[in-house]
């Protein structure tokens, strides 16, 4: 699964905070992902950021990721969901 963040113009970014959705619902269960990666768009290609801190998937808090600064128009989270569960993002902050 993936979700994208588009800027109106090229922007330098160096970190993100992701608050993962995790709760039980009558329609299905939502869990933090098993894993995730962050990509940025360079030209027509997606490249993984050079992470400077661990990728975390903790529930009930922001999961902070520092990375080598990049200038881009788009970011993309690619998440590997836990088997049998849905996933989601409550909030995604970009700095």
For every predicted segment, state its role.
Residues 1-50, 56-95:
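Aromatic, loop-rich ligand-recognition surfaces of beta-strand-rich domains
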């Amino acid at each position: 699964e993936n979700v994208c963040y588009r800027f109106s113009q090229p922007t330098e970014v160096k970190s993100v905070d992701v608050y993962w959705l995790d709760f039980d619902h009558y329609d299905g269960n939502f869990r933090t992902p098993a894993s995730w990666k962050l990509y940025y768009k360079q030209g027509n290609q997606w490249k993984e950021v050079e992470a400077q801190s661990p990728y975390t998937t903790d529930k009930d808090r922001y999961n902070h990721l520092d990375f080598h600064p990049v200038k881009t128009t788009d970011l993309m989270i690619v998440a590997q969901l836990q088997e049998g569960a849905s996933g989601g993002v409550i909030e995604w902050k970009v700095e």
